[in-house]
Amino acid sequence: MDNAKIVIKSIKDYIVEVQGDYDFRLYEVFQLTDDVKGFCLSVDEKRTFLLIDGDTSKIKVGTEIIPLESRFIAKTYKDYFGKIIDIDGKVLYSESEDQEISEKAYENENSAFKVASGIQDRVKLNEPLETGIFSIDILLPIGKGQRQLILGDSKTGKTSIALSTMINQKENDIKIIYVSIGLKSNDLKRIYKTIVEQKIAHKTILMHASSDNSFQQFLIPYVAMAHAENIMQSGEDVLIIFDDLTNHANVLREIALLTGKPVGKEAFPGDLFYSHSKLLERAGKFKNGYSITCFPIVRTINNDMTSLLASNIASITDGQIVTNSEIKDQGILPAIDIGLSVSRTGSSVQSVSLSKIAIEISKIYSKYKQNEKFSDTNFDLNDSVRDIIKKGKILLKILNQKEFQAYSRSFNLIIAYIVVWGIFEDEEKIYDKLIYLYFVLRYDYIGKILVNVVDKKSGVDGMVDEGVLKAEIMRLLAHFKDIHNIKTKSYNDGKFNLSTRVLHKVKDRIWEK
């Protein structure tokens, strides 16, 4: 009887139990007062609980409540890009003076709790989503439509990896949704500032739920995923980042305790896995040719990957990038533990050239780790071990990549070849050499031609001519020592066969150091 009276039975913090001769439905919204709403999150034959959005001091036991038509259907307005919004689409902050939202919106409108598409609506992942980070794009390749967990202790660079990936999409058509779940205001400001400074605000929606609003924290990942589905179904690829699901899980635990739901390990409810699987399984690559790539972020304590939440999300996703505080303490950033990280799509999203060289880099890394204990000894090692140690040390230097300094696919491929060839004489000035090559290959006329050839030849089925590439890189590196040793700017540009613009850029960067 939908016309029956519904009243509040009890109030526990932000959870309200209601009763009445009414056919309660999960996810239904109720009006408690003029500015307080409730969301039906648990219903059975005996009890019904609402999650409250608003000040519970304004309501009391016995108050009659009214069911609403709303069931959290997300409508994605195109003016959301470049702004921070909440689950209702209200603008919380915008760099632009115009904070009004026009009526121009994506056609599709999905429910926040839409059931994930079946296998018949999905296709195999075969396109890369490049992060610009050497260690990930070479050793842990990610595909469009992949669900890739970012897991690690606080302050180990998880958010930085996500932001770097976002920045690397600047030149393509991928839309981005960054979901802030209970982040501190200072962290949120820093993220938004980075998005604006890196000129990706025009393609990014930043959604935020404050740490003191459990209602918004509970709902925001589901609402954000509905926005991602709206965009994807309109013919655009989407990257969605949940930062972080640890805060979301903590809200689920609080709700379970307040509603008397049975809890288990770490006091989490038994349906914790289901709560996150029904969210993350909505990502993927679909038959319309477009995708939703998902990066859930989870915090660990003391690098412990065996916690319930971490193991749950790892079993749902298609791989994990593990950051480690001990690696960070060694000064290596991003602090990715390659031994514990994995991408289950692997070479299926890499070109033949990248896949081939990635295998060689992986071998060098693993063999170096096996022989690392001999690296600082005076033992008489055989040539193969010495070669592995030399290449391994150089590889570790290259893995230490500056924040937001994205490497293109062709540059990553060239760096990987350099490591395998062993043409860096030693591990000194590795960063300077990379900067030199970066500017030459990006800005110099001859360098651009070389990169274009590498891009073309390293397509899905193409192969790079290693002999030609090696000869050209050796020629460029032969000039590095002379350029690095120049003490003044009164040098003969023509001596190095490089454009004046590039030579100035390279030399200025080296002088800065």
UniProtKB/Swiss-Prot annotation:
GO terms for molecular function: ADP binding; ATP binding; proton-transporting ATP synthase activity, rotational mechanism. The record marks 341 as: Required for activity. It comes from the Bacteria. Keywords: ATP synthesis, ATP-binding, Cell membrane, CF(1), Hydrogen ion transport, Ion transport, Membrane, Nucleotide-binding, Translocase, Transport. Its EC number is 7.1.2.2. The keyword Magnesium does not apply. It is a peripheral membrane protein. ATP binds at residues 152-159. It is found in: Cell membrane. One of its GO terms (cellular component) is proton-transporting ATP synthase complex. Its main location: membrane. It catalyses: ATP + H2O + 4 H(+)(in) = ADP + phosphate + 5 H(+)(out). Produces ATP from ADP in the presence of a proton gradient across the membrane. The alpha chain is a regulatory subunit. F-type ATPases have 2 components, CF(1) - the catalytic core - and CF(0) - the membrane proton channel. CF(1) has five subunits: alpha(3), beta(3), gamma(1), delta(1), epsilon(1). CF(0) has three main subunits: a(1), b(2) and c(9-12). The alpha and beta chains form an alternating ring which encloses part of the gamma chain. CF(1) is attached to CF(0) by a central stalk formed by the gamma and epsilon chains, while a peripheral stalk is formed by the delta and b chains. Belongs to the ATPase alpha/beta chains family. This is ATP synthase subunit alpha 2. The gene is atpA2.
